[in-house]
């Protein structure tokens, strides 16, 4: 594996049964992403973007091939160990923010840190720093329903990186936002990736944002190809 490679997929297969027929989504897919790199995943709906993110994020088991995270093979690991890797090394951002409505922005960002064993004080300090970095420190006490769409997504991004993961997987993170807000949220995301050295794989239909990333890949006949 090349130096600084965070995620490496080698010959990954993923199939689903559909009405007695085997549907092949990923067919010998190869892909790698390195520290500090932002890669756009641009492909039509139904071609396997979410499947790829789920396999890369250890949410689904591949039917063949290898998934390596930071040089460690994840095939054959128990569900407990896969969960431990997800919690410590992988952050997820989705099109819908999935923030807990009864908690403030600050508390939402603290939550994964508290689960990881940090003290309330440590988690609060880290959450506050992330809110400041995302330029919404003044909104920390507000609940998700009191935030704008762009603010909600910035909180979701901050929560995703709260435990300092090495890999960020995002599925249409700006899909529900207007173009101006989407660009602003991506600016914040890009700055965070560059500053922290994260590797980020971002699925998007927004070609303008995709062109701003380091590389663009798509899924063609079950394989991952640059374009």
UniProtKB/Swiss-Prot annotation:
GO terms for biological process: lipoprotein localization to outer membrane; protein localization to outer membrane. Its EC number is 7.6.2.-. The keyword Transport applies. ATP binds at residues 43-50. One of its GO terms (molecular function) is transmembrane transporter activity. PANTHER family: IMPORT ATP-BINDING PROTEIN, LIPOPROTEIN-RELEASING SYSTEM ATP-BINDING PROTEIN LOLD. This is Lipoprotein-releasing system ATP-binding protein LolD. It comes from Rhizobium johnstonii (strain DSM 114642 / LMG 32736 / 3841) (Rhizobium leguminosarum bv. viciae).
């Amino acid at each position: 594996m090349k130096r600084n490679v965070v995620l490496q997929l080698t010959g990954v297969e993923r199939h689903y049964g559909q009405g007695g027929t085997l549907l092949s989504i990923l067919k010998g897919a190869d892909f790698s992403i390195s520290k500090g790199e932002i890669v756009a995943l641009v492909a039509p709906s139904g071609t396997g973007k979410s499947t790829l993110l789920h396999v890369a994020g250890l949410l689904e088991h591949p039917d063949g091939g290898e998934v390596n995270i930071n040089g460690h093979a994840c095939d054959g690991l128990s569900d407990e160990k896969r969960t431990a890797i997800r919690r410590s090394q992988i952050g997820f951002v989705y099109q819908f923010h999935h923030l807990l409505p009864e908690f403030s922005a600050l508390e939402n960002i603290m939550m994964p840190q508290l689960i990881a064993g940090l003290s309330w004080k440590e988690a609060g300090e880290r959450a506050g720093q992330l809110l400041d970095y995302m330029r919404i420190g003044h909104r920390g006490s507000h609940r998700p329903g009191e935030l704008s769409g762009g603010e909600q997504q910035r909180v979701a991004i901050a929560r995703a990186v709260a435990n300092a993961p090495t890999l960020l997987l995002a599925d249409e993170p700006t899909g529900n936002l207007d173009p101006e807000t989407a660009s602003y949220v991506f600016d914040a995301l890009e700055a965070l990736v560059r500053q922290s050295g994260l590797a980020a794989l971002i699925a998007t239909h927004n070609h303008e944002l995709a062109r701003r990333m380091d590389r663009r890949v798509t899924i063609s006949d079950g394989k991952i190809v640059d374009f």
